[in-house]
Amino acid sequence: MTMRIAACVAAIAVSASFLLEAQVKSFRPVTEAMLRNPAPGDWLNWRRTDNAWGYSPLDQITRQNVGQLQLAWSWSMDDTGSQQATPLVYDGIMYLPNPRGVIQALDAATGDLIWEYRPGATPPPAPAAARPSGGEQTDIPRLSQRPATGGGDTGRGIQRNLAIFGDKIFGTTNDAHIVALDARTGRLAWDVKVADEKLGYEYTSGPIVVRGKVIAGMTGCSRYKEDVCFISGHDAATGKELWRTSTVARPDEPGGDSWGELPLMFRAGSDAWIPGSYDPDANLVYWGTAQAKPWARVVRGTDGAALYTNSTLALDPDLSLIHI
């Protein structure tokens, strides 16, 4: 009797996997035009559109009926760090960033989990009944519930956003990796280590996607070292780094004299805490940077502007050049 019940439970679980997979199999690749002008019910960027206006055209909720809203469902997010997440929503699927690189896909109507990705966790193999003859993976796994290992012990594990383009979801980790996942299954497509977390580097925000490039800003620039924070662009298909722009002016670069005679290892700060935005008409990416470190000029040992701290940078997404 017990074996019969277990078999029934397994059959139901496999059936549920097929139902959830059917939702994801209808996935349509996301284009640049969609990122610029999403369907009214979609939220495809941190601030919905690539220009980061944060405006939704939906009008069902009004001043008159907002008081009638009720809880439809709730979801317990990962508890390994601080939460500052903005999810993506596309075709009824919610893609949710969690602390320390954990990414989940939920049915936006019901809150049911479709898949989950955890750095360092290996997804279980598909049940035999869920494998078609061609060998294609058709079930959607919930990965191991052990704590995520990709975040290390850096910071508070904050991950503010994800990006979506083509058939992939893009995220960053607190140990300075950028990852791409199959949006249908959550399977890892590629993983690129961008900087050394042992030197303090980490991501606290996810990337944006512009003209086929995954662009992300680095943080963790409070420790003095022979390098500085930066914004980098990567091929969305492979993760290959295409360019890197320092957010601190180096001694031999334009603006380098704004730090006086300080050597590079004493030029700190200019973290890129928040995701950038894109103006397609000007073909420019805009990114904000934080203060110089130490904060006080007298402690830094310079009275200059300390470029490019406390700034909004305009970058050519193809060439990485800063437009001043």
Task: Please name every model-derived segment.
Residues 119-165, 173-231, 242-264:
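Asp-box/WD-like beta-propeller blade repeats and closely related beta-sheet repeat scaffolds
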Residues 108-110, 183-185, 236-238, 317-318:
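Short loop/turn segments that connect beta-strands within beta-propeller blades
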Residues 322-324:
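Conserved small/polar residues in nucleotide/adenosyl-binding loops
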Residues 228-240, 305-319:
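Beta-propeller blade signature
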Residues 57-79, 144-146, 259-260:
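A short helix->beta-strand "capping" segment at the edge of beta-propeller domains
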Residues 28-71, 250-252:
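Blade/loop signatures of beta-propeller domains
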Residues 6-17:
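Bacterial N-terminal signal peptides
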Residues 43-47, 82-102, 139, 150-177, ...:
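Repeat-blade elements of multi-bladed beta-propeller folds
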